Amino acid sequence: MAQPLLSLRQRFESTFSSHRQEIFMFLSRIQSLGNGILKPHQLFSEFQAISKIDRLKLEDSALVQLLNSAQEAIVCSPWIALAIRLRPGVWEYVRLNVHQLVVEELTVPDYLYLKEELVNASSNGNFVLELDFAPFTASIPRPTLTKSIGNGVEFLNRHLSAKMFQDKDSMHPLLDFLRLHHHNGRTLMLNNRVQTVNGLQDILRIAGEYLSKLPSDTPYSDFEHKFQEIGFERGWGDTAEHVSEMFHMLLDLLEAPDACTLETFLGKIPMIFNVVILSPHGYFAQENVLGYPDTGGQVVYILDQVPAMEREMTKRIKEQGLDIIPRILIVTRLLPDAVGTTCNLRLEKVFGAEHSHILRVPFRTEKGILRKWISRFEVWPYMETFTEDVAKEIALELKAKPDLIIGNYSEGNLVASLLANKLGVTQCTIAHALEKTKYPDSDIYWEKFDKKYHFSSQFTADLIAMNHTDFIITSTFQEIAGSKDTVGQYESHTAFTMPGLYRVVHGIDVFDPKFNIVSPGADTSVYYPYTEKKRRLTALHPEIEDLLFSSVENKEHICVLKDRYKPILFTMARLDNVKNLTGIVEWYAKNPKLRELVNLVVVGGDRRKESKDLEEQAQMKKMYGLIDTYKLNGQFRWISAQKNRVRNGELYRCIADTKGAFVQPAFYEAFGLTVIEAMTCGLPTFATIHGGPAEIIVHGTSGFHIDPYHGEKAAELIVNFFERCKTEPSHWETISAGGLKRIQEKYTWQIYSERLLTLGGVYGFWKHVSKLDRIEIRRYLEMFCALKYRNLAESVPLAVD
């Protein structure tokens, strides 16, 4: 007979009874550190510091197993409280009394209260605002298996299709959905001649028999009038064959529904014609902006995403038998002081697309339009007015409501939430990066960060957006729920506190079926393998040669490579703390063997002008210090940010020509677009294990994982690769080919676009026919936004032109 599972408290108590002395000594050691918050590596270090005999006795105990799952410890004598992550998304909280060796289970508010006591005990006597979104999602089905995280639409379709389609009466929401379907006043799918499910089945069979006698390529216009008389309108397909496929799918659903058929059917229904994409911050333009402050991977992502989406929308609309022109608007900020960019133009056509445009709307206050760039951390006072202005501008451009609104990053997702709520439109959220995970303890010590980063506004906006949206897409599983040992970006918002501000008891559930993993790719017109000689941009080679090897030092490049025949270790990113470009320079500088084997080329920061970004200024100062301290000139080249994407693509390929490698050393990377770009060009890649690259790369097969917190080991791994390539040249080719194979299987914009548009349709359908519109939570969020977010945003100083 199976034994019942022991609770967390019982597991601790069983260890206390068998190892009382050893546990007392260990916990006393932790307590002696004084009151405070300890991270997992500190707990591990303290355990390693106890006597070897005690360590051996405890190694297999439940205490150590649970300590290995602890993400944090709060020492508040005589108690030690632990936040234990049993698996991704599943947490429990306990506290241990060091003197009495007793254990108590804690609720989330109890645990957060103890944490607040350490930081701001004086505020705990007052009423504390608690945020708890759990009651609003209680009726929404959720999976329980870790493998289901990020596969929300599959779970939702399985669960709700089984529930909805139990009998013919429960089919009415689907019938109503098809009958109410329209675009710009034009009825699609079914007209009012179809009143019942039985009636729908009858005409599907009649029409199916008629279609079976026609040539498969017969255009819909040939039988449009006949079908209209029995209840069908346009939208089923452009030819007899496509219409017949749709009819058969719907008949199958009405007879014996299954999740796969339902998703395929919904993906083919014409639902998305107009899309609005929000990305307010930075310098959003198509040329000469990459490397500007707050302007990097997100801009590239959207400019690659939009042409691919437009192509997929155009293809679907044609196959649906419609003559509607799809429109995509990328809404960003208009910058009157455009600094040599097109950011002062209201409307700009997107390269590679026919009907997609960048629509720019300025930030304004009562005093007028803000002219200059401001940091993404300072945008909060402008967002609500910006939203109102955006609503007017998109109405002017589209002459209709959008069918899907996609937000990007914190402020883009907040604006998307406000717009979607105002217009009643399906909303998609893409975080790219949630700052709370990039800056450790930025929640508990928010007041220390707030003057510089205004995280109180940003974290509040993030909570509003992730709970308001209909669906969230992420590039990786790690973005949602981390890994066995690390907490995911969204998962870190499950429970946290900002003392004196509010306490989040239940912020988000990573098992929520709104989460879906949809990985992007690289623009294959720009990024393609170095081996495709006929496509190579040889006309650019002289200037790339000059960029890498010229003996001239100026504001575009400093330091000279003396041995131009060595392989190049290459990295390219924004110059900020998290991207850690100075980290890779330091690893290289301190490893004589690596310096002997390869040259290091870093592209990042803009030395051609004075940076207004404080982080970039600090990183530049550090870079100059490393160059001087380690005498890197001769083996190292520092190039200012390169804004020409086409040339950057050829630059990757030229690095591959040297049999070099790409390294991405970030402390955390939500996805890793440069990793995709480098691998698409055939460049062997070393990338951080913290975040998305851990999923993109299969270690040792399509690249290598490195830990930026252990730079010496990372440098040794790179040394080992290049040493092996010297003795076994085919090893370089093997890793290069492995990277290309990985990209082609999983990371292309075509796969991405197909998935995103299907998700938009499926969630739009479920929102219409079930309670997934989450009305209750949206009313709660309106109040939270008005009473808390607005005050926080108003406390952020307005910029001065």
UniProtKB/Swiss-Prot annotation:
Exclusively expressed in flowers. It catalyses: an NDP-alpha-D-glucose + D-fructose = a ribonucleoside 5'-diphosphate + sucrose + H(+). It comes from the Eukaryota. Residues 271-748 are annotated as: GT-B glycosyltransferase. Keywords: Glycosyltransferase, Transferase. The keyword Glycosyltransferase applies. Its EC number is 2.4.1.13. It holds the Pfam family Glycos_transf_1. The keyword Transmembrane does not apply. GO terms for molecular function: sucrose synthase activity. GO terms for biological process: sucrose metabolic process. Sucrose-cleaving enzyme that provides UDP-glucose and fructose for various metabolic pathways. Homotetramer. Belongs to the glycosyltransferase 1 family. Plant sucrose synthase subfamily. This is Sucrose synthase isoform 2. It comes from Daucus carota.
